[in-house]
């Protein structure tokens, strides 16, 4: 994997900097590194593909070295370099694709394709190493079963979940009370509602709670907490739990009271925030508990009182909500996030070449399925294919 990254980094630099008119002295170190890559690869043969519709390709290396010059690089020099660069880039691209479409239930962190296994040989250690990639650093740590740490922006840690629970219900569905939520990606939105606006509740107050368990521990997380759930702020028709009918939800938004958010790790509270909105932090956690209240306004203007009558029919439904958004966090496991395209890169290659479903990943690389059942085998394989995808993205956009 280190060699593949170093190849890709060398080729990217060469493609960007070996251009007509450039002073040789400005790229002499790069050309020396480029020539070392050629010397190391010359005389070797590789084969990629042969799975799904990914075609078998044979690769043979026997390229001449780039020479020295006292002047600027001319068109002939650059054309010679380009022919070599293009072949190497095509090779790296195919090695990456060959690796991204393979999986293994055992030791999935290790190279799975013949070509990448061959590049792990001692001969190729002479290629200049560049381990500045976070993915490469963590792949090396995971390969040695040491602790890893990925920094994510808006990590996709929450499997998609959208539903509701009713604490009070009737066959007519005309006086309901309960919670509804949408968990997806890095965001939780939860709303508590009471058609009667807590008219008969103790102290005219309804208590709501929403607990979300993460599939992996997050650390040093920066989080946004807002006293609103905009996705539940407009009327909608909702299917009943048994699917026999539908019911109407017509929210009128109130501000939640006594808001508390707890971050827990193995059942122990690590951080607690009460009535604090905006940016908060959490040290480490695997569970989030949100609690909040809907309180009937003690004083109402006639217009507000008309919204919340003391008896049925209740045409407007008192609603309070919260939004919790994980802006950034560190996780020992690899995740999809908002700042990278690794999941899309891997998935698109597997779809394009009709790769058959293997023993580890779900069909279509369904992220909700993958993260819901995030086994050690899936974690190893995902880290490997994401690392390869990060290498490929240096050369192929």
Curated annotation (Swiss-Prot):
GO biological process terms held by the UniProt record: fusion of virus membrane with host plasma membrane
Ranges where the record places region Interaction with the inner capsid protein VP2: 62-73
Keyword Zinc: yes
Further details from the record: The VP6 trimer contains a zinc ion located at the center of the molecule. The zinc ion is not essential for either trimerization or transcription activity of the DLP. Zinc-depleted VP6 has an increased sensitivity to proteases.
Function statement: Intermediate capsid protein that self assembles to form an icosahedral capsid with a T=13 symmetry, which consists of 230 trimers of VP6, with channels at each of its five-fold vertices. This capsid constitutes the middle concentric layer of the viral mature particle. The innermost VP2 capsid and the intermediate VP6 capsid remain intact following cell entry to protect the dsRNA from degradation and to prevent unfavorable antiviral responses in the host cell during all the replication cycle of the virus.
Family, as annotated: Belongs to the rotavirus VP6 family.
Name of the molecule in the record: Intermediate capsid protein VP6
């Amino acid at each position: 994997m280190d060699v593949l990254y170093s190849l890709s980094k060398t080729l990217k630099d060469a493609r960007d900097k070996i251009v007509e008119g450039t002073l040789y002295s400005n790229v002499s170190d790069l050309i020396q590194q480029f020539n070392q890559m050629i010397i190391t690869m010359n005389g070797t043969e590789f084969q990629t593909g042969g799975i799904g519709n990914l075609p078998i390709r044979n690769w043979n290396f026997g390229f001449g070295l780039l020479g020295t010059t006292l002047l600027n690089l001319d068109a002939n020099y650059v054309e010679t370099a380009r022919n070599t660069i293009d072949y190497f880039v095509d090779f790296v691209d195919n090695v990456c694709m060959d690796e991204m479409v393979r999986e293994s239930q055992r030791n999935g962190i290790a190279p799975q394709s013949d070509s990448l296994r061959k590049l792990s040989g001692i001969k190729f250690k002479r290629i200049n190493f560049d381990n500045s990639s976070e993915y490469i650093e963590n792949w090396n740590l995971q390969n040695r079963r040491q602790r890893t740490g990925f920094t994510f922006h808006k990590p996709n840690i929450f499997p998609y979940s959208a539903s509701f629970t009713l604490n009070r219900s009737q066959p007519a569905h005309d006086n309901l009370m309960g919670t509804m939520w949408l968990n997806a990606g890095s965001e939780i939105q939860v709303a508590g509602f009471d058609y009667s606006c807590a008219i008969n509740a103790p102290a005219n107050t309804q208590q709501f709670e929403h607990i979300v368990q993460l599939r992996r521990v997050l650390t040093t997380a920066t989080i946004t907490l807002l006293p609103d759930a905009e996705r539940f702020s407009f009327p909608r028709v909702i299917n009943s739990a048994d699917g026999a009918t539908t019911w109407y939800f017509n929210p009128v938004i109130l501000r939640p009271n006594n808001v508390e958010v707890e971050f827990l790790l193995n059942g122990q509270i690590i951080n607690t925030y009460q009535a604090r909105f905006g940016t908060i932090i959490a040290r480490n956690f695997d569970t989030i508990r949100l609690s909040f209240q809907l309180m009937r306004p003690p004083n109402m203007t006639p217009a507000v009182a008309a919204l919340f009558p003391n008896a049925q029919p209740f045409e407007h439904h008192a609603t309070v909500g919260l939004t919790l958004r994980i802006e950034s966090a560190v996780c020992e496991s690899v995740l999809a996030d908002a700042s990278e395209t690794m999941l899309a890169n891997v998935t698109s290659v597997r779809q394009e070449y009709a790769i058959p479903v293997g023993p580890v990943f779900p069909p279509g690389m369904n992220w909700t399925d993958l993260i819901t059942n995030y086994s050690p085998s899936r974690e190893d394989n995902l880290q490997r294919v994401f690392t390869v995808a990060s290498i490929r993205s240096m050369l192929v956009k």
